[in-house]
């Protein structure tokens, strides 16, 4: 026969196990809401246009970011990490719009926050546009948002992993990849930011239809200014 104390201990351990399991499930469920995500602070045109960018190549030169969109507007991708296979997938998706953007006269650019080894060179085949260095990471701000261990328990992240993997995209672990990226459609002159997409989790891509719709507004605005 079991001693009463043994039964009480067994019941206590069972209760603790059930409680721990319930807490774990509750934690995972909460992690898949937006409750613990860093709040996004929207960028302003004044904030972005004075950003110092550098060309990447044999003769790197510095210039103000507003030079990218002042005349014709621009679509600008803020790449989280060039070696990330999710970022390569998003770059490929955006590049699929290149011919339509060309018809609108709207250029496609990307910025990276670091230039390590040949990472940008290896990223270039996925992105049909020029890539520049934003050393201060202003396109990732004003409030830089990070995703760390939370990303490992979010269902959306694993779905994004699966989607990119099935698409045949590969990558590496080189460079900083915790600061989340984004995408901007910026109008010509002082027209402003027409679309701002902030990556809320790894692999959270901008809606391509929304990108084109915003780019079409640039084209119309420029045509009105020319008349």
Curated annotation (Swiss-Prot):
<keyword id="KW-0963">Cytoplasm</keyword>
<feature type="active site" description="Redox-active">
    <location>
        <position position="84"/>
    </location>
</feature>
<keyword id="KW-0676">Redox-active center</keyword>
<feature type="active site" description="Redox-active">
    <location>
        <position position="87"/>
    </location>
</feature>
<dbReference type="GO" id="GO:0005737">
    <property type="term" value="C:cytoplasm"/>
</dbReference>
<dbReference type="InterPro" id="IPR036249">
    <property type="entry name" value="Thioredoxin-like_sf"/>
</dbReference>
<dbReference type="GO" id="GO:0016209">
    <property type="term" value="F:antioxidant activity"/>
</dbReference>
<dbReference type="Pfam" id="PF13911">
    <property type="entry name" value="AhpC-TSA_2"/>
</dbReference>
<protein>
    <recommendedName>
        <fullName>Peroxiredoxin-like 2A</fullName>
    </recommendedName>
</protein>
<keyword id="KW-0049">Antioxidant</keyword>
<comment type="similarity">
    <text>Belongs to the peroxiredoxin-like PRXL2 family. PRXL2A subfamily.</text>
</comment>
<feature type="region of interest" description="Thioredoxin fold">
    <location>
        <begin position="13"/>
        <end position="111"/>
    </location>
</feature>
<comment type="function">
    <text>Involved in redox regulation of the cell. Acts as an antioxidant.</text>
</comment>
<dbReference type="InterPro" id="IPR032801">
    <property type="entry name" value="PXL2A/B/C"/>
</dbReference>
């Amino acid at each position: 026969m079991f001693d009463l104390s043994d039964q009480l201990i067994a019941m206590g351990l069972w209760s603790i196990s059930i409680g721990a399991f319930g807490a774990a499930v509750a934690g995972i469920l909460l992690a898949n809401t937006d409750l613990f995500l860093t709040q996004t602070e929207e960028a302003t045109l004044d904030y972005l246009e004075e950003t110092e960018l550098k060309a990447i190549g044999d003769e790197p030169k510095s210039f103000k970011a507003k030079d990218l969109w002042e005349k014709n507007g621009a679509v600008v991708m803020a790449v989280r990490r060039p070696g990330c296979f999710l970022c390569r997938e998003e770059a490929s998706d955006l590049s699929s719009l290149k011919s339509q953007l060309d018809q609108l006269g709207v250029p496609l650019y990307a910025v990276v926050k670091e230039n390590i080894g040949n990472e940008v060179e290896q990223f270039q085949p996925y992105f049909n546009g020029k890539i520049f260095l934003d050393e201060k990471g202003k396109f990732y701000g004003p409030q830089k948002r990070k995703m760390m261990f939370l990303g490992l328990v979010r269902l959306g992240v694993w779905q994004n992993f699966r989607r990119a993997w099935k698409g045949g995209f590969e990558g590496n672990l080189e460079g900083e990849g915790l600061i989340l990226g984004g995408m901007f459609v910026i109008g010509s002159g002082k027209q402003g930011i027409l679309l701002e997409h902030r990556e809320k989790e790894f692999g959270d891509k901008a809606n391509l239809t929304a990108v084109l719709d915003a780019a079409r507004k640039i084209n119309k605005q420029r045509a009105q200014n020319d008349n």
